[in-house]
C-alpha cells in the first residue's frame, strides 16, 4: 500500500502510516516513527518523483522548551504563542537547518537547507532542479538548488 508521512511538531518526528489505515494514534500500532530527533519542529512535507522526502522546519529546536516542557501542555502553549514570542524561543541561527531532504529508499540524508533568510519555513515544494520555500512573513517564495 501507499505510505502517508505525517509531521509531529510536539515530538519533533515524522510518522509513517499506511494510507489506508483508520483511527491511528501517533506511536500506536501501525504507526511508526520514520524519522525522529529532528533538529527542528517539522511543518510542511513534500515528496518528489525520485522518492525524496523534503521536511521543512517551522521553528528551530528550542533548548529551553525541550528542557522545560515535561508536559505536552507547556509545549503546546509555546508552539501556539504569539509570533514575537515564538521568534525569541525558536529563532534559527545561520547554521540551523530550515529544511532537509532524505531518501525514502535508503533513509540517507541528502541535503540540508540553512540560513536566516529561510527562517520559519512554512511550506516546501520540490520542482525539477529547485526547491521552493514559503517562509513566514515573506512576500515571495525562496528557492534553492537541489
Language model: regions and residue ranges:
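Beta-propeller blade signature
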Residues: 89-106, 146
Amino acid at each position: 500500500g501507499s505510505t502517508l508521512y505525517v509531521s509531529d511538531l510536539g515530538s519533533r518526528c515524522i510518522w509513517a502510516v499506511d494510507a489506508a489505515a483508520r483511527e491511528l494514534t501517533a506511536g500506536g500500532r501501525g504507526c511508526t516513527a520514520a524519522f525522529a530527533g529532528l533538529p527542528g519542529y517539522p511543518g510542511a512535507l513534500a515528496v518528489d518523483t525520485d522518492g525524496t522526502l523534503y521536511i521543512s522546519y517551522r521553528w528551530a529546536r528550542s533548548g529551553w522548551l525541550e528542557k522545560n516542557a515535561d508536559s505536552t501542555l507547556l509545549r503546546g502553549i509555546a508552539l501556539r504563542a504569539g509570533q514575537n514570542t515564538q521568534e525569541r524561543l525558536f529563532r534559527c541561527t545561520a547554521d540551523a537547518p530550515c529544511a532537509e531532504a532524505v531518501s525514502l529508499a535508503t533513509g540517507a540524508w541528502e541535503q540540508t537547507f540553512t540560513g536566516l533568510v529561510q527562517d520559519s519555513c512554512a511550506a516546501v515544494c520540490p520542482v525539477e532542479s529547485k526547491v521552493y520555500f514559503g517562509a513566514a512573513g515573506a512576500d515571495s517564495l525562496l528557492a534553492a538548488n537541489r
